[in-house]
Amino acid sequence: MIYPQIMHKPALPWVFRRPTQEDGLSIHELIAQCAPLDQNSAYCNFLQSSHFQTTCLMAEQQELLVGFVSAYRKPEQQNELFIWQVAVHPSARGKGLAYQMLKHLLAREDLADITVLETTITRSNQASWRLFQKLDREQGEQGSVSTFLDETCHFEGEHDTEYLYRIPLQSSN
């Protein structure tokens, strides 16, 4: 007799935590596996995991890095959080991890004063559009989209247009 509940064990839960400087290279390797995200230098990922620990988040499963959110407070608008990248390992996609990472990040006590979330997305990145549209719906559908960096004007045709998605957050994230 086959016992399906034994054959298909549920996945272990994700563990969310702040990155440390020691995580920089693992983050760099994760992002390399997460097309269509732009690969930044390993140095950049070390800075994200050390200088921006309070606004970045890692997700691990069985002590393996499966997700990372890089974000920062905008220098001139400290109550606005800019989400730079949301990376999910191919093995963890389609399970709601990206959304859970954003929710855990926004639930941090030291980010309780964040009133606006921003990100940029290229037209072709459908996974990111779905993710941020879901968050926008949850927050009352007050989000707006505008051109941030134009393919022709800013990138001379070398990169797709980046659209700025701005989502006002309700007081209880």
Curated annotation (Swiss-Prot):
InterPro entries for this protein: Acyl_CoA_acyltransferase, Ectoine_EctA, GNAT_dom
Record CDD domains: NAT_SF
Keyword check for Lipoprotein: no
Disulphide bridges: none
Pathway the protein contributes to: Amine and polyamine biosynthesis; ectoine biosynthesis; L-ectoine from L-aspartate 4-semialdehyde: step 2/3
Gene3D superfamilies: 3.40.630.30
Keyword terms of this UniProt record: Acyltransferase, Transferase
Domain of life of the organism encoding this protein: Bacteria
Gene Ontology terms for molecular function: acyltransferase activity, transferring groups other than amino-acyl groups; diaminobutyrate acetyltransferase activity
Family: Belongs to the acetyltransferase family. EctA subfamily.
Protein name as it appears in the record: L-2,4-diaminobutyric acid acetyltransferase
The species this protein was found in: Vibrio cholerae serotype O1 (strain ATCC 39315 / El Tor Inaba N16961)
Gene: ectA
